[in-house]
Amino acid sequence: TGDIATGVLAEIVVDAVLQVADDDRRVGRDDVRVFTRTGASAAATELVRGVVFESEPANDNMPRSVEDATVAVLDMKLDVRSGEIDTEYTITSVDQLDAALSAEDAERRAIAETLSAAGVDVVFASKKISDPVAAHLADAGILAFSNVTESEAHAFARATGARRLGTLDDVEASDLGTAASVRVERHGGDDVTFLEGSDDSRTVTLYVRGSTDHVVDEAERAIDDALGVTVAAYEDGEIVPGAGAVEVAIADRLRSGANAVTGRKSLAVEAFADAVDAIPRTLAENAGLDPIDALVDLRAEHDAGTTAGLISEGQTGIIADPIEYGVLDPAAVKREAVESATEASTMIVRIDDVIASN
């Protein structure tokens, strides 16, 4: 993960999961967003309660920071409404042209006035905001963003409590959301916008920083993996020792059970146990240990009633209690792995013929 401490990264991930979890310990994975940007030390990585995204205001004269914002999330184009039927008008004088242009400008101004009258400070539109409408919004002191993505619009609504509106007819206070602040900052030569949600915001963003693209990419991959296992552990509520300790216990129970199975079935059970042993064997090799000696030592510790696994310590590995070293796995992940392996093995064993291709 580059120059960011693993402990700091882990703490940020846990905080993110806890902030978006509901009362039933369910976590919407889409509610935890990851946004990356180079140009700063990885130590600047932070958790934002809200949404971080790359976008610039629809007009340069708009404010770049709004506190205690009232937010509208719109699934509509902000411009003069076009009719369902193409209509052609014949203009025969300058006065008629001026009147037509004035009518269009009045309609565009009305969009800004409607939003302003509703108390809106910030607008996120999933479709285009025309330049004239953006200018009127700027005159009204409204910060607006055009052409936001579908995932961003969903996140804005979750972070602020706003409803996504397809029309400005009869906008009510309950349709709008709130944000502690919305601000546009310059990071790495680009405009980066921060929407800080309220206390009940259901969306958070892990803003990952790094000095190079490589550092950022490594941190993002680590965060994605960490989020997956953290969500699994939190939702299931059960964890087990990692570092191969569980696999050693499973293999031991399988071999003990194989003695009670008669005939050729016992060979299948033994083979399954050998396959499970592949995990601690691989961990031993990666830690620079002899895999056979490591397996013998692990089995001895297990027979003695001790929880033991393969822990990376400096340039080599040691056999120790993974719980003491904080090496834990979600029970749900282990359970799913065993079930999937059992299903795959059963399917292969049931094959009684092979058809060679060509």
Task: Report the location of each language-model feature.
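Non-catalytic terminal/interface segments that mediate subunit docking, oligomerization
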Residues: 62-96, 200-202, 206-213, 217-225, ...
